Structure formats: C-alpha cells, structure tokens
C-alpha cells in the first residue's frame, strides 16, 4: 500500500546522520570505519554501501586524506559520510567539486553545512515545498544544494521502489 510505503520511507530518511560532535574523536581502523558507515546509514542505504576498496580508492584519488597510521579520524568519517550520500546521484568529479566547495573553511564547517542542507531539504520535502532556492544565492551554492537534493531524491526513490516490491 503506497501511503504505508511513503510513511516508512519518511522514517528511513537520513535525518539520523550524526552531528560533528557525535562522530568518534579517536582513530578508527578500516573495519571499524566500515561498520560505522553501515550502522550510520542503515536502513537509508543498503548494507555494504561502503567497502574497504572504495575507501582506499577515495584516498588514492584524493577525495579524502591518507589515514594517520592506518587510523581514520573525525574528518575522514565526515568526508566518507558526505561521499556516501552524494555518490547516489553524482559522479566522483562532481563530488570532488562539491566537497572542495563545502570544506573550503575546513571539514568540520563543511560537514555542518552539509547536514544543514540535508536537514532543510528533508524538512521542506515533508512540507511539500522545497525552499532551497528562494533566497538570492550564487551558482556555487545552488550547485551544492542541487547536488545534495539530487542524491537524497535518488535514495528516497530507490527506497520507495523497494517498499512497493515488498
């Protein structure tokens, strides 16, 4: 039943992403990072959405910095959380541009901004009207908001389709 699927979908949105202060502030090994990613976005994203080889590739192409002594810190986790959402709809090149723009004042500020944008999109969607572009914003800010919105819409669409099949 579609209304039930829509209610369930709203419960599964990514509103539970951790705030910066709630991200572990100790170094985590790769297996711990993967487990955290699975738990953070379950059930919004499929289990196994982030793999060791993906994380290694993100380091290799420069999307995230190299870990210090094989340990990943808060900045790595925040970057991986943003990548995990954005990759649902965007190319790695687009994700790289968005992350550079988001994090130009540091990863903590960028992650906070990312969370604020996703929260605004989710709140607007529940109200039936997306108000992301109502105020005067430059092209870069519009691209940031549009990219996040595209990723969230892709995630929500996939989950709705899964709910309809169930």
What function would you assign to each model-found segment?
Residues 1-10, 14:
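Single conserved hydrophobic/aromatic residue that forms the stacking wall/gate
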Residues 27-45, 59:
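DNA-recognition alpha helix
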Residues 48-57:
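Short amphipathic alpha-helical interaction segments
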Residues 67-82:
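Short helix-start
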Residues 83-102:
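Short, amphipathic alpha-helical interaction segments positioned at domain boundaries
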Residues 101, 105-166:
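Intrinsically disordered, low-complexity, charge-dense segments enriched in Lys/Arg
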């Amino acid at each position: 039943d579609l209304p039930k699927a829509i209610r369930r979908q709203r419960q599964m949105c990514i509103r539970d992403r951790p705030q910066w202060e709630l991200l572990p502030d100790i170094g985590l090994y790769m297996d711990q990072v993967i487990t955290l990613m699975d738990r953070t976005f379950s059930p919004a994203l499929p289990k196994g959405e982030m793999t060791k080889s993906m994380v290694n590739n993100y380091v290799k192409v420069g999307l995230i910095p190299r870990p210090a002594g094989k340990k990943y810190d808060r900045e790595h986790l925040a970057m991986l959380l943003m990548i995990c959402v954005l990759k649902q709809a965007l190319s790695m090149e687009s994700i790289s541009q968005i992350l550079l723009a988001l994090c130009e004042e540091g990863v903590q500020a960028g992650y906070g901004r990312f969370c604020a944008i996703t929260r605004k999109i989710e709140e607007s969607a529940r109200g039936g009207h997306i108000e992301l572009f109502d105020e005067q914003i430059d092209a870069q800010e519009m691209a940031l908001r549009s990219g996040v919105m595209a990723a969230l819409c892709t995630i929500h669409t996939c989950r709705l389709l899964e709910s309809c099949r169930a």
